[in-house]
Amino acid sequence: MTPLSTVVRAPATIANVGPGFDVFGLAVDGFHDVVEAHEADGVRIVTEDPIPTDPERNTAGRVALRMVEEFDLPGVSLEIRKGVPMGGLGSSAASAVAAAVAIDREFELGLEESELLRFAAEGERAAAGEPHYDNVAPCLLGGFVIWRFEREYVRLEVPGDLRFVTVTPTGVRVTTEEARKALRERPPSLDDVVNNLSAVALMVHALHEEDAETFARMVGWDRISEPVRKRFVPRYRELRETAYGTGALGFAISGAGPTVFAVCWREDAEDVRTALEDVLDGKCVSAVHRVSDGAEVA
């Protein structure tokens, strides 16, 4: 660690969490991006990972540029170590959130959560072309987050006996832009919207009641994005059937994909992970996750 620097770890996230399109997000442990910030001239990106080092094209760099400009800072160097797989687990959000928190702490800005979220979401423009809060909010705050506006969000606790199994197929890339364009090609019907609204309401109620099973089951009730985006996931139907057949309570696409995730009881999680890996002949990155408490200073 560089002297007089600040190091922050930010976790992977599952956006949408099934039917909660652009509204729900969940932070999970196991995968993290690490950003180290220290004062420098201008804004510099240092990394050994295959990501852009031009600050305008890097999510963490975008955050730094905006914060340096707004607070008249001398400049900052960001060393980025990527640990979140790309493809539906909030990789760009993790770097953006870690950068915002690291710069805030390094320069003792004392920003509120809402301000950190604003800067982190601005960083998402580099990856997605527009701010997306359903990844950055849970990444910063931890837990399960319901998002509406920049200053209007709720964090809820997820029952501790649930596990989240993520599987990211290798060699498959889906951009957020592609995934959103696909949604416009098939507008949801009224029945689809009603289905998702009821599932979303039941998920929130289940969390308040600490009803883990209902929460997990409703994850698999997306009728807006899944029918369109499943084509981006290799062997999606087989993955879904295998997950449920091995004990999963819920199954859905994580964010824009191609990552998928299953919600399971703790004792079933490893069996589900192994079975899903087998469907893809091991050509994937998989993990079993607990819920994360969000970004933290290392």
UniProtKB/Swiss-Prot annotation:
It comes from the Archaea. Gene3D superfamilies: 3.30.230.10, GHMP kinase, C-terminal domain (3.30.70.890). The keyword Repressor does not apply. Pfam families: GHMP_kinases_C, GHMP_kinases_N. Its EC number is 2.7.1.39. ATP binds at P85, M86, G87, G88, L89, G90, S91, S92, A93, A94, S95. Keywords: Amino-acid biosynthesis, ATP-binding, Cytoplasm, Kinase, Nucleotide-binding, Threonine biosynthesis, Transferase. One of its GO terms (molecular function) is homoserine kinase activity. Pathway: Amino-acid biosynthesis; L-threonine biosynthesis; L-threonine from L-aspartate: step 4/5. The keyword Acetylation does not apply. Coiled coil: none annotated. One of its GO terms (cellular component) is cytoplasm. Belongs to the GHMP kinase family. Homoserine kinase subfamily. Catalyzes the ATP-dependent phosphorylation of L-homoserine to L-homoserine phosphate. PANTHER family: HOMOSERINE KINASE, HOMOSERINE/4-DIPHOSPHOCYTIDYL-2-C-METHYL-D-ERYTHRITOL KINASE. This is Homoserine kinase. It comes from Methanopyrus kandleri (strain AV19 / DSM 6324 / JCM 9639 / NBRC 100938). The gene is thrB.
